[in-house]
Amino acid sequence: MLARPETDTSVDYYAILKLQKNATFQQIRKQYLFLALQYHPDRNPGDEERAVKRFQRLQLAHEVLSDATKRLIYDQLFGLSTRTRSQYKPNSTSNPSKHTSAYASYNKGKNSKWSSPFASTTKKPQESSEKYSKKSSTRKKEHFNKKPSFPRDTEYSHIYNMKYDPRSGIGIRVKRQEPESLKKENNNSDYLPKSAMKQKKGGPKDSSKHPSNDGKIPESKPSVYKSRASNLFSSNEQSIHSSFGSKFHFDKSSNPFSFEFSPSSNAAKPSNSEECNIPKFNSSFKTSNDFFTFTKTEESSPYSFSFKLEDSNTPKFKSSSKPVKSSFVFTKPEAESSNPFSFDFGSSGPKSRSDTRNNIRTPLWTSSVFEKPESDLPNKTAFGFMRSNTSTFNQKCDDFSSASFMKEKTEFEEQLQEDNDHSLGDLFSKINISTESPSVAMPSIPVIQPPSFPIFSSIDFNVRNREYWNQLMVFQKLYSKYCTESQHFINSWINIKKELHIVPVNWEIFEKVEKSWDQCEEFVAEFRQTEEKYFLFLKRLRELINKNQML
């Protein structure tokens, strides 16, 4: 809001009209018409801008002085301001910023014009003849002697002076500057707790010994949760897409049933080996476009496997661990069996209830058609399938579950583990290739849902963090069991297909088995996709750990 012209004391309207302050209204009118005609913009061609400004000032002065009310207000305000500013202008020699003593500043203030409430209407007070020393310190800077920014400089402005020291007392005292180290020590010692004082007396840590930190407190790096799912997989993100290029190598050297599976597409090929790649096929299953949700339709298969992730931010993550090459080899145990084509899926002692169920020796497939001479059978012994990696993993999971923060489990976690153990079951079903009713029963993939990422708060961070890791460990065990048994089924089925290619077979009898090959190939492809989804889940989990410091 603009001020009214009669209250603007910064402009002398009498000087603009070139009149005395006691001029009458008629003189003001006559002088205005004369000057308006002289400074009219039409009378000043070539200098219109300057003429317009002068003409506007004349109009403003005539408006204020021709009105009796406005003129009275203007005369009162302008006269008061004129006397105050002209007669009582503070002396520039008595700059309060030059006084370095509290006594000098106080004594000087007694003679100032602001010491009396009627200073604006009384006469100019007598200046004291006493002179003070104006010595300035050698360490002063430019901004110390700057005048205050408020309009009227008072004698009490030493309050805002940075050099004024209220502890100096009466008289002139020299204030010496303390060393930086002593100043920091004195300032910090007044506010530090007792524990910090004790640590301080022991001696501060020298940050110069660690030039990489530059004297700053090093940030605590959150530990990354390493996957304990299975040795079948690599935690390196570069090996996520390599599972689709998996190849099976069959060794011809000694054991006709020994082969090696490597999940890495860049694995070195052994000598004297031939590759058996799974042929391409057109899948009949409908999959979703969502990369983290895979569900088979009820028309094709009753099983489903799904991953649901809440967090959509996926920053880059690089793991320092190298991919582990896993191998599955059929070996010959010492004990003989009545069936020469039975496979043992457990060789180590059971670790838990699920391990006991897995270690049951079940004939995977039997047939009376493939009769070979005794010379072709190596020592008439049964072929056992060694599963040392899985037992080692289960033992590690048991050790991990007995950690200090995992000793006690909630009722929800125990119920979750019990339900999943019962629903998981044995993935191995008998593959019957008998002459009467040949059939291949595909294993049903259980629904294993990873726990959703928790939303932490500062209050229940520790409680929810512990519950989440308990649930995640239960999921890791179930998923490891599923992956291991599925891989066993795939390897055994490939071995059967190899044997069927070697021995002549009457395909009229085994028509159903031939049709089951395509189903097995689809199962293998879906299993590879499940592996990839699981790796992406672990990648998201590591990113969330680094972001929120969940460990």
Curated annotation (Swiss-Prot):
Species in which this protein is naturally found: Schizosaccharomyces pombe (strain 972 / ATCC 24843) (Fission yeast)
Domain J, first and last residues per copy: 12-78
InterPro entries, per the entry: Apopto_cytoskel_mod, DnaJ_domain, DnaJ_domain_CS, J_dom_sf
Stretches with biased composition (Polar residues): 85-122
Biological processes per GO annotation: exocytosis; sporulation resulting in formation of a cellular spore
Name recorded for this polypeptide: Meiotically up-regulated gene 184 protein
Positions of the UniProt region annotated as Disordered: 85-153, 176-226, 334-359
Gene: mug184
UniProt subcellular location: Cytoplasm, Cytoskeleton
